[in-house]
Amino acid sequence: MLNLGRARTGRQNRSMSFEGLDFADPKKNNNYMGKIVLVMTLTAMCILLLNQSPTFNTPSVFSRSEPGVTHVLVTGGAGYIGSHAALRLLKDSYRVTIVDNLSRGNLGAVKILQQLFPEPGKLQFIYADLGDANAVNKIFSENAFDAVMHFAAVAYVGESTQFPLKYYHNITSNTLVVLETMAAHGVKTLIYSSTCATYGEPEKMPITEETPQVPINPYGKAKKMAEDIILDFSKNSIMAVMILRYFNVIGSDPEGRLGEAPRPELSEHGRISGACFDAARGIIPGLQIKGTDYKTVDGTCVRDYIDVTDLVDAHVKALEKAKPRKVGIFNVGTGKGSSVKEFVEACKKATGVDIKVDYLERRAGDYAEVYSDPRKIKEELNWTAKHTNLQESLKMAWRWQKLHRSGYGSSSLVSAY
């Protein structure tokens, strides 16, 4: 493309002397005039092309507002849960913008989504850090969002105790940036991804939405602080807010298109399902279960495991039910706990591998039982967990793991599904 601005500047700064022109020579004169005509013709053609170009003339489809809630910003949409949420939204005919800095997410997941939904105006990916307020403001300025699903966050309890400031910055501070920018640009719906870690060590089970929030680690504390900011802001705002506190997430897309692919350097902080799969694949020698003397059915900790497909369904239902000036807070779980021993046995059956297990002393800070009371979300959002067979959820996740041994490193659409 011609740099028209520079061409004009150069012509203005150059001294125009007529002494070198021989007007008495018609050949020289015609040659000079021909060059002028050629330059003028090329300039006119460039201007015409620029005016006709959709890049210059037509605004992006993502910058246009449409009736209703049609365009959703998914922060952290390249991550495990966020990518599954983006997939569901796209299947439900929403337009989706994913914003992710890829510190924990996978570009491969975005590429899969782009292959599945190649139509113009359906999906766009923007590489950005939510901690950069100027970048976030620019994104909101150039796009007409109807709602935000805010997943982006570091999310390992163990890591949060080692690097607490990282968690307060990434979760609490970044949520403040998102909320301020939403308010500045009139985006009126927020679906916030929170956690049962905000409850800490409840004295009574099951956990309801009224259970006191007394988090015991920086991850839970950072999430609760973010919740408090959102709730304080909502008191004098027309924003529709839904806060979903979910429990232990497992599983993967039933059609095998997406899965969980944490970075290897973070495996020590990862979910128990990841450790089980690593043991089944021989990446680690076996599992270490810490604590067999809890007051539970078999002495090991009891947790509520929610399939990612059900979790995403809860987010979509929350989006559909969100009302201006209203705040909804919901636990997202099955309402049933499974012990660590039960989980490991289900994983052995799902993988077909007799995983070696070592039993160690209990770890400080772990609590015996954590499971939800899902009655509120059932009554108000008409949501219930459907994928409650632990072995089946693990089997689906294992199938993806076997076909993607390097995660999304060599990801492609798998025809086996």
Swiss-Prot record:
Q: Where would you find this protein in the cell?
A: Golgi apparatus, Golgi stack membrane
What does the entry list as the binding residues for NAD(+)? Answer: 71-102
Q: Which cofactor does it need?
A: NAD(+)
Q: What family is this protein classified in?
A: Belongs to the NAD(P)-dependent epimerase/dehydratase family.
Q: Which GO terms describe its molecular function?
A: UDP-arabinose 4-epimerase activity; UDP-glucose 4-epimerase activity
- Report the pathway entry: Nucleotide-sugar biosynthesis; UDP-L-arabinose biosynthesis; UDP-L-arabinose from UDP-alpha-D-xylose: step 1/1; Cell wall biogenesis; cell wall polysaccharide biosynthesis
Provide the GO biological process annotations: capsule polysaccharide biosynthetic process; embryo development ending in seed dormancy; galactose metabolic process; pollen tube development; UDP-L-arabinose biosynthetic process
Gene3D superfamilies registered for this protein in UniProt: NAD(P)-binding Rossmann-like Domain, UDP-galactose 4-epimerase, domain 1
Species of origin reads Arabidopsis thaliana
This protein's membrane topology, according to the annotation, is: Single-pass type II membrane protein
* PANTHER family linked to this entry: UDP-ARABINOSE 4-EPIMERASE 2-RELATED, UDP-GLUCOSE 4-EPIMERASE
Would I find Transmembrane helix among this entry's keywords?
yes
Q: What is this protein called?
A: Putative UDP-arabinose 4-epimerase 2
- Domain of life of the native organism: Eukaryota
Q: Which NCBIfam families match?
A: galE
The residues annotated as the active site are 219
